[in-house]
């Protein structure tokens, strides 16, 4: 910091723990939900997605049922004016089930049947493609430690966090980047957020199969050299971890991210060893101790 100026002592974190932005966007033109519907349907949660698909399916069938009723008695063997019979006829038509008891009568009803069959095919194609796209998106399956620690390693203060591979399959050519994000003041007195890439003792692993302790030595080249817990908080410092690699099961690149605030840094702590020896002599990775920190 320069000129003795400091930002306010406390602010909400800029990055959520999953690495996503915690910034509210203002001044944008109001965007309707359907303006970017493909992205929205890919990113909403599964319960919301299933609810939307089910709701759209029921509403569409209900609308066609009302259309059949508006045409009069155009469904053979259906009870006159029965919305239930018209609705289930619509379901059978949209799904091309065709049990044979309920039959459209006349050109108007058959026109509606043709239109509904087309809507059913298009709807099935869209729903199936969305479900396939959601299911086939590769995920890294990487676990990040809930805390970072700053303690001595080989006689030098070191910022450390660790991650673990939750799957049996290996991740090839794994890369980790650790970035410091903090508020700084320019020579003109403007407060801005600056990103500092932190040098790691090892930022790449040819094979990532178990756990990995990521370490940044705090020497005179480090952006956090000489910093204390108080000064890091005053600059609203946050640490963003970015992980990328090629997953052998998916045969695709995967990525993961995690962010830490100053509240999630343990000064003077060290991670508990997660490797143990079983009674038969085999080595094991105990993920139950993954987040444990000793002083």
From Swiss-Prot:
GO terms for molecular function: identical protein binding; inward rectifier potassium channel activity. GO terms for cellular component: monoatomic ion channel complex; plasma membrane. Keywords: Ion channel, Ion transport, Membrane, Potassium, Potassium transport, Transmembrane, Transmembrane helix, Transport, Voltage-gated channel. Gene3D superfamilies: 1.10.287.70, G protein-activated inward rectifier potassium channel 1. It comes from the Bacteria. Residues 70-82 are extracellular. SUPFAM superfamilies: E set domains (SSF81296), Voltage-gated potassium channels (SSF81324). One of its GO terms (biological process) is regulation of monoatomic ion transmembrane transport. Coiled coil: none annotated. It is a multi-pass membrane protein. Changing residue 38 to F: Decreases channel activity. Residues 83-95 dip into the membrane without crossing it. Changing residue 93 to I: Increased channel conductance. The chain crosses the membrane at residues 48-69, 107-131. The keyword Transmembrane helix applies. A motif (Selectivity filter) lies at residues 96-100. Residues 1-47, 132-295 are cytoplasmic. Changing residue 98 to D: Increased channel conductance. It holds the Pfam family Ion_trans_2. Inward rectifier potassium channel that mediates potassium uptake into the cell. Inward rectifier potassium channels are characterized by a greater tendency to allow potassium to flow into the cell rather than out of it. The inward rectification may be achieved by the blockage of outward current by cytoplasmic divalent metal ions and polyamines. Complements an E.coli mutant that is defective in K(+) uptake. A conformation change implying rotational movement of the cytoplasmic domains plays an important role in channel opening and closing. Release of polyamines from their binding sites on the cytoplasmic domain may block the ion permeation pathway, preventing the efflux of intracellular potassium ions. Belongs to the inward rectifier-type potassium channel (TC 1.A.2.1) family. KCNJ11 subfamily. Homotetramer. This is Inward rectifier potassium channel Kirbac3.1. The lineage of its organism: Bacteria, Pseudomonadati, Pseudomonadota, Alphaproteobacteria, Rhodospirillales.
């Amino acid at each position: 910091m320069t000129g003795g100026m400091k930002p306010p002592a406390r602010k909400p974190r800029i990055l959520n723990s999953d690495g996503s932005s915690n910034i509210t966007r203002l001044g944008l033109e109001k965007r309707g939900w359907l303006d970017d519907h493909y992205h929205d349907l890919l990113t909403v949660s599964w319960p919301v997605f299933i609810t939307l698909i089910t709701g759209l399916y029921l509403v569409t069938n209900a609308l066609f049922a009302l259309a059949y009723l508006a045409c009069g008695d155009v469904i053979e063997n259906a009870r006159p004016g029965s919305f239930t019979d018209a609705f289930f006829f619509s379901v059978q038509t949209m799904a091309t089930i065709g049990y044979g008891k309920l039959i459209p009568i006349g050109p108007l009803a058959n026109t509606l049947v043709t239109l509904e069959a087309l809507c059913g095919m298009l709807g099935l194609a869209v729903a199936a493609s969305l479900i396939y796209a959601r299911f086939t998106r590769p995920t890294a399956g990487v676990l990040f430690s809930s805390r970072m620690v700053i303690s001595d390693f080989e006689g030098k203060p070191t910022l450390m966090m660790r991650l673990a591979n939750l799957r049996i399959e290996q991740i090839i050519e794994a890369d980790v980047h650790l970035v410091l994000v903090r508020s700084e003041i320019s020579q003109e007195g403007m407060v801005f957020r600056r990103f500092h890439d932190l040098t790691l003792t090892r930022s790449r692993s040819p094979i990532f199969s178990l756990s990995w302790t990521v370490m940044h030595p705090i020497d005179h080249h480090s952006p956090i050299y000489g910093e204390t817990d108080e000064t890091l908080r005053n600059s609203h410092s946050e640490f963003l971890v970015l992980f990328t690699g090629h997953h052998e099961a998916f045969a695709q690149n995967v990525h993961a991210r995690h962010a830490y605030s100053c509240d999630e840094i343990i000064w003077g702590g060290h991670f508990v060893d997660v490797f143990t020896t079983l009674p038969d002599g085999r080595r094991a990775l105990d993920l139950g101790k993954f987040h444990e920190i000793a002083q």
